[in-house]
């Protein structure tokens, strides 16, 4: 399939009560597409009016309890040769000019890089802040591709998936937005689980939902079961492992987390995120086992964060957090060295 002036490229959104962010999203993508298609599922704020003011073709539908159904209805309405799928709390940071160029050639699915920002403190002993997590998500679809799944829906297609040099920002994980969405997806996830009880991706998403509500013990159960059946080549296995290790630590199971990290180390030799979390786990152990802190745990923390700096940033890794291969690791090392120095002087 080639793309030319007669080929339509549409930005396709499903929305509900997104007045806070809809204009920003549509204004960022408008210059790069032929059509803005918005399907509203029951907004009670000014979302519809703002979308129309931004030039969108707005349609309305009742919410039927499935994100896949809504996505597919929006794709039917768009009727475009290529579809860029966006959420209202996202906006293009860079690469908009690459969209149309990428669509030249044979049909395939495009994965774009989504930078999700957080306010949350990742409550490890190092008080780790997660400012930006990177995810490569399939969002650019040729005509005919449709979604499956009530929640955390996925496009289903035998076509190959390739990365597009398109970068989105996403602020839907900021605390103020998460509080509004608390528990919104849980019921849908549980329904999906009854139909697909062994699906590792559903288990992973349930764990993330529980982690977001600080239910760390429950999250560990779902992460553990997800990890058992997640293939080594699954692109989201990296993020799954990091979330699982973090929740084990928060559940007071740092020793168990370190054993798991040891078993998984060969799979992620070049992940700064993996070694950053290992450093945090070692610091947790130093606090819970002070007798061996100087001899064992603090040196392990230091060498782990040094490894992060040696690897550098890896934005190509699913679930990678910006800074773990640079300033966040350096900060932890600086704090550790200053505190260790004080401890040695006092001895």
Where are the predicted features?
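N-proximal low-complexity "stem/linker" segments adjacent to membrane-targeting elements
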Residues: 1-28
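Short beta-strand/loop segment that forms part of the nucleotide-sugar
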Residues: 13, 34-42, 59, 88
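Catalytic-site signature of metal-activated, phosphate-bearing donor transferases
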Residues: 8, 68-76, 92-221, 225, ...
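A conserved acidic beta->alpha catalytic loop
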Residues: 28, 40-52, 63, 87
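Acidic helix N-cap motif at the loop->helix transition within catalytic regions
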Residues: 20-23, 45-54, 95
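Conserved donor nucleotide-binding strand/loop of the catalytic core
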Residues: 34, 48-73, 77
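Short aromatic/hydrophobic "clamp" motif used to bind/position activated sugar donors
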Residues: 83
């Amino acid at each position: 399939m080639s793309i030319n002036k007669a080929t339509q490229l549409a930005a396709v959104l499903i929305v509900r009560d997104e007045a806070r962010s809809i204009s920003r999203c549509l204004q960022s993508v408008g210059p790069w597409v032929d059509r803005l298609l918005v399907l509203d599922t029951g907004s009670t704020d000014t979302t519809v009016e703002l979308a129309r003011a931004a030039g969108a073709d707005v349609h309305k539908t009742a919410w039927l309890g499935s994100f896949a159904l809504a996505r597919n209805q929006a794709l039917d309405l768009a009727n475009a040769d290529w579809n860029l799928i966006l959420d209202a709390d996202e906006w293009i940071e860079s690469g908009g000019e690459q969209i149309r160029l990428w669509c030249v050639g044979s049909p395939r699915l495009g994965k774009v890089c989504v930078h999700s920002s957080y306010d949350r403190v990742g409550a490890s002993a190092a008080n780790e802040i997660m400012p930006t997590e990177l995810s490569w998500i399939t969002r650019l679809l040729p005509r005919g591709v449709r979604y499956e799944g009530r929640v955390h829906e996925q496009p289903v297609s035998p076509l190959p998936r390739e990365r597009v040099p398109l970068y989105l920002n996403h602020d839907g994980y900021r605390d103020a937005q998460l509080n509004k969405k608390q528990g919104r997806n849980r019921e849908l996830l549980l329904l999906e689980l009854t139909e697909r009880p062994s699906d590792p991706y559903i288990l992973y998403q349930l764990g993330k939902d529980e982690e977001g509500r600080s239910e760390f013990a429950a999250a560990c159960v779902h992460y553990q079961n997800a990890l058992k059946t997640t293939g080594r080549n699954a692109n989201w296995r990296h993020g799954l492992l990091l979330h699982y290790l973090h929740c084990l630590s928060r559940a007071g199971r740092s020793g168990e987390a370190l054993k798991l990290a040891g078993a998984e180390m060969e799979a992620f030799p070049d992940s700064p995120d993996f070694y950053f979390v290992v450093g945090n786990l070692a610091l947790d152990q130093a606090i819970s086992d002070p007798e061996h802190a100087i001899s064992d745990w603090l040196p392990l923390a230091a060498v782990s964060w040094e490894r992060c700096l040696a690897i550098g940033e890896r934005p190509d890794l699913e679930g990678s957090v910006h800074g773990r291969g640079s300033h966040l690791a350096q900060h932890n090392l600086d704090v550790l060295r200053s505190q260790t120095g004080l401890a040695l002087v006092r001895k």
